[in-house]
A protein has these predicted regions:
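Short acidic-glycine-tyrosine-enriched beta hairpin
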Residues: 72-92
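Short glycine/proline-enriched turns and hinge-like loops at secondary-structure junctions
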Residues: 51-53, 60-61, 78, 97-100
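A short glycine-rich, His/Asp/Glu-containing loop-to-beta-strand
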Residues: 13-55
């Protein structure tokens, strides 16, 4: 994954696809002020239980049913197409595409700190020590 922002004023550039153990993400915008991604979560998979120290993000469900967890808000909630969630720095959260369902596709817009992830639990042994 490149941390180099896209060239200002350039009309078209290839989106960067990053394979993940839970699916993939496509980085379609990367500037010094924001990042835009599309996340594809395979059924039965989930992202790390994590938080960000600086990164501020908002997700929007494009398709599928997304299970979200937040320990700060003490919620386990289901989001469907058209729903959005703003996640602030320090808020512990996790996304999941339920087993037997459809893949979940999310639009994510965030501040540009791509490597600001503190993993607390992870199904793929990527927990930070």
């Amino acid at each position: 994954m490149s941390d180099t922002p896209h060239e200002p004023g350039k009309i078209s550039y290839p989106a960067e696809v990053v394979l993940k153990p839970w699916g993939w993400e496509k980085i379609w915008a990367h500037t010094d002020k924001y990042v835009g991604k599309i996340l594809h979560i395979n059924p039965g998979h989930r992202l790390s239980l994590q938080y960000h120290e600086v990164k501020d993000e908002t997700i929007h469900v494009l398709s599928g049913i997304l299970k979200v967890y937040s320990t700060k808000l003490q919620i386990e909630h289901t989001m469907s197409e058209g729903m959005s969630w703003h996640i602030i720095p320090g808020q512990i959260h996790r996304f999941e595409a339920p087993e037997g369902g459809q893949p979940v596709v999310l639009l994510e817009v965030s501040t540009p700190e791509l490597d600001d992830v503190v993993r607390l639990k992870d199904d793929y042994n990527r927990v930070d020590d």
